[in-house]
Structures are given as C-alpha cells and as structure tokens.
Amino acid sequence: MGDTYPRRRDYDYIREKTEQTFYNRDVATKELVDEIYATVNSRKAIQIISLAKSTIRHNVEKDLHKLTLPCCIVWGRNDTITPPEVADSFHRLLPQSELHWIDECGHVPMLERPEQFNPIIDSFLQKIKM
C-alpha cells in the first residue's frame, strides 16, 4: 500500500487496498481494515509509507546475488501486488534459496494461509539449524 499516503484518511480506499492484498477478500475483515486504517493514520505512518515507497523505487534484484545465506521464499500464487514471476526471478538469483508456492493466496501468505505458511517456515528453520 505504498501509494496510499495521499488517500490514507479515506477509509473506503484503505478497505479496497486491503481487500486487494488477499486472494480471499473475506480475510480483510472489518477489524483488520480498522487496524490498518489506524496504522496508516498514526504518527509513524509517514515513516512506514516512506519505507514502502523506497522499496518500490529500489530494484532489489541487482543485489540478490550478494546474499549467501539460505533463503526461504514463500509466495502466494495469486499475488496481484507482486506477481509470481518475481518469485521465480528471485529464486533464480538467490543461490541458496528454496521457493514454496501457496495456492489461492495473495500478497500476504502469513496472514491469509498461516496453516500452510507456518509449517514451511518451521521446516526451513529446522533444515538450517546449526
């Protein structure tokens, strides 16, 4: 939601953006939308939104080859914010990465499909345990 700063006080706009984040729009409950609305309208919102906008401007792909640690990429197959092709590209560029897809899932698999996301992360952490 990096582009929401000018309209952050527009509740309907925040609700719409929140719904677009998920494959299953029912995940964007009123409680979640209320929480996000409060967050983007807090004093720290400008810093958060500024950080989000900086990620849009910075192309991380050119730096990924520098990462030498194991990486776990978990991607919603129905992500409309950052398309699945980006996950494939990141996976190719990260030498020690594994890529996991979650079907019927949008941009935030940890919120939309925690029952699938958490075991993937647990398994990855067990593998890299030193």
Q: Which residues does each PLM region occupy?
A:
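Conserved alpha/beta-hydrolase "acid-adjacent" motif
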Residues: 80-86
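Short beta-strand/loop motif that positions the catalytic acidic residue
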Residues: 67, 73-75, 79
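Generic recognition of short, well-ordered alpha-helical segments
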Residues: 62, 85, 112-115
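Catalytic active-site module of serine/aspartate enzymes centered on a nucleophile-bearing elbow/loop
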Residues: 96-130
